[in-house]
Amino acid sequence: MGFLYIDGHVRAYHGKHTISQTFVARRHLAMPATTDYWINDRAGDPLLLITGELDASLTKAFPDLLREVRAAVGERQVTIVFDRGGWSPKLFRSMIRQGFDLLTCRKGKTRRIAERRFVHRRAKLDGHWVSYDLHDQPVRLLGGKLRLRQITRLCEDGDHQTQIITSRWDLRDIELAYRMFERWREENYFKYMPEEFLLDALVDYRIDPQDPTHTVPNPQRRALDKQIRTARADLADLERQYGAAAADNSEQHRPTMRGFKIAYGKLGQQLRTARERLRKLLDQRRQLPKRVEVRDLSEQTLVKLATERKHLTDLIKMLAYQAESDLMNFLRPHYPRAEQEGRTLLHELFATAGDIHVTEDELQITLAPLSSPHRTRAVQILCELLDQTATVFPGTRLRLRFAVRPPPLIGLAFPGTPAHRGAASAPSRPRNRTF
């Protein structure tokens, strides 16, 4: 549990109640939604789940998340891995003071590093070889008060560079880069669970009242921010035009500034109008508070979805996923394509018909063959491994015994070996009969 991955997962809401809006990245728009923050281990398996408060960004959710992590792991030193959504040097300093290490990607523009300064690294991690072109250096944030380590990866195209920030000085740069880019495991979890376990399903219709005094960013100010960005872009474009006209002005035709202003009076008027518009927008924004209370946003009562049943069903789904992952670990050494289709094989196994026979001390389960011989053989090995666990059926003293009926030697789905096919297709010889 040396590395824990934290990220938010947004659940869109399509019901009739009025709940807060959240930006849903996969739909590229803001809509009624709830954000759940998941904490996964380095294999991508879930450990903890916290439902975020109204309009809580990852940086604002971190204090609660860290308290839950500390309660779960005790005083052990763990490294928290997260994306740019949690970028905050002040947060980093607070995490380090609480005994956590951090690993994240740097946000914002940084100076490009010369390609010749990168070093090729190659190592075997988690059983497979990885290689990166890396540059390692110390950096200072918060005006030099916070010293961290920056590892930059040069991508294969030779153009893009990714900066990784960490407080870990004891590990090799290639291992830290590998752990950072292993975030795809958590992303895969967010993709897999809604499809296979209905993670985003609405499990009940209960609602809880939202705290009316809770503050959120002022939507009017947010709308003004958009207008100000547009006004600044328009002003910058007019200033470029006016500057270009001044640079190209011929002194033989217009030797004085007065003549230039008269000649470009229309453009000058547009420039002054744009400046005045920007000034008014900035004045309007200064008069608006940055945050407002929820009760001031709408006449409708803002509510939030109840979490008790949702968390209970999520817990059951987490356990089911963990059991599936444990079966994957049993299967992996005996099924070459386990990473690509191992879970698909397990889904077929779960839906396979079978026979149940009860004896005095055993519950014997014999499954039908799967869709292909190589899958059937893999499941046979899995059954043997499960038998070795000596698992007892809950509430009884019956030991579970698993088996798979062997596939038929000949058939459309199981054509058998060439020898079997030859034997089956060979004409039968007449038998000698004695009288």
How should each PLM-predicted stretch be described?
Residues T273-R275, K280-F435:
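C-terminal accessory/interaction regions of large nucleic acid-associated machines
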Residues Y189-S250:
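Charged, amphipathic alpha-helical linkers/stalks
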Residues G2-R11, G44, Q77-W87, L102, ...:
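Short, conserved catalytic/metal-binding motifs centered on acidic residues
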Residues D234, L238-V292:
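Extended alpha-helical coiled-coil "stalk/arm" regions
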Residues V24-V73, Q161-T162:
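Electropositive, glycine- and tryptophan-enriched low-complexity nucleic-acid-binding patches
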